[in-house]
From Swiss-Prot:
Family named by the database record: Belongs to the MinC family.
Name of this protein: Probable septum site-determining protein MinC
Entry-linked SUPFAM superfamilies: Cell-division inhibitor MinC, C-terminal domain
Species: Acinetobacter baumannii (strain ATCC 17978 / DSM 105126 / CIP 53.77 / LMG 1025 / NCDC KC755 / 5377)
Key words, A-Z: Cell cycle, Cell division, Septation
NCBIfam families from the UniProt entry: minC
Subunit composition and interactions: Interacts with MinD and FtsZ.
């Protein structure tokens, strides 16, 4: 029997992009973010648009309960290699597009049981905006559709090399061949629904699964994807 085994490639991770190298500012802003979600112990990938003292930044993240795993190649690449810290290839640039339409609802914060209602009144301290983005056309290769305040509904499919990201749920009425990322920001109750699953990657709240690991019985089938009690991705074939 071999002494080495390679198993599934699903893991919880988040990507953090830094636009400042002021560690006091980073600590303050990260503290606010971490207090809003269940990020304790999360594996993180570091990206930066400015020069950083990488070792000090890694130590800062560890002190805040995060687990730095790698950096994105670019400004930090050479410094990371010098200390033998993992470097991941930089992303290919995507064109962020606007949805065909958006619907805004005012909802109570999660602590309230009140239903969402649409209103034109200003937000109060107990309410937040929930936005649903609708897109009528196929998402083409190199395009990205992002909604960081709610859900996304694609009325057509998406090509390989495209990407859809939502803080909430994602519904795709067509074939999925790109990357589908729901629950961005740590919303573990988010779900993904699609008519035909051929995705390059699916992710909910940082737990992801690449194409090779998607269960064969749901490939090219209507699928409901969610996180179970163990925070593992579940793929449920749907009968339409």
């Amino acid at each position: 029997m071999a002494d080495i085994r390679i198993t599934g490639r699903m893991v919880n991770f988040s990507r953090i992009t830094f636009d400042t190298n002021d560690h006091d500012v980073i600590r303050q802003q990260l503290s606010n973010i971490l207090n809003e979600g269940s990020y304790q112990g999360t594996v993180v990938i570091i990206d930066s648009t400015v020069e950083q003292e990488l070792i000090a930044l890694i130590q800062l993240l560890v002190s805040m309960g995060l687990q730095p795993m790698a950096v994105i190649d670019g400004i930090l690449g050479d410094e990371a290699r010098a200390i033998q810290f993992p470097v991941l290839p930089a992303d290919q640039p995507l064109q962020r597009i606007k949805p065909t339409a958006e619907q805004v609802a005012i909802v109570e914060k999660p602590t309230s049981a009140q239903a969402s209602v649409e209103t034109k009144k200003p937000l109060n301290n107990n309410a937040v905006a929930h936005i649903t983005s609708y897109h009528d056309e196929i998402l083409r290769t190199g395009q990205s559709l992002v909604q960081d305040q709610g859900d996304i509904i694609l009325k057509a499919g998406m090509n390989s090399g495209s990407e859809v990201i939502a803080s909430g749920n994602i519904h795709i009425y067509g074939t999925v061949r790109g990357r589908v990322i729901a629950g961005a920001g740590g919303h573990a109750a988010a779900r993904i629904f699609c008519q035909s699953l051929e995705a390059e990657l699916v992710s909910i709240a940082g737990t992801y699964c690449v194409a090779d690991d998607i269960p064969k019985h749901v490939v090219k089938k209507p699928v409901h994807i969610y996180l179970n009690e163990k925070q593992e991705l579940e793929f449920e074939a749907l009968e339409l």
